[in-house]
Amino acid sequence: MAGPEDPLPNWGTGRVNLLGDAAHPMYPFGSNGGTQAIIDGRMLAWELARADDPVAGLAAYEDACRERMNALVLSNRQGGPEQVLQLVEQRAPNGFTRIEDVMTNDELDSIAMQYRKTAGFEAEALNTQPSWEVAKPA
């Protein structure tokens, strides 16, 4: 049985499916729980509008989102972008004055970029993905 922070093997069956925290419960890191629920809702609406039947739309929604969200659940288990706090505590247990004395800008940028990539928030990926607009029947 999956624990509260373990990725779920599936989000639904037939005409019943989960989204948001119900589908991908995770530690509250990265400040994106609400964002992920909105993205899920938008993707679900898009897939349902494109599908010939609701069951196919629900399956397409899960197929489109589950792998990325499972990676994000696992990333958040490791602290997500807040892993910076763990590293700083390890490197400077007695405190510090400037973050640059503890971590390089490259390290900070790398952690942030990796999380954006895992979450699907990289600017290039967002700017090149197809529109979620569904053509209305004439």
Q: Which functions belong to the PLM regions below?
A:
Residues 1-78, 82:
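Conserved mid-domain beta->alpha element of the FAD-binding
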Residues 22-28, 42-54, 62-67, 84-138:
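C-terminal lid/capping helical subdomain adjacent to the catalytic/cofactor pocket in oxidative enzymes
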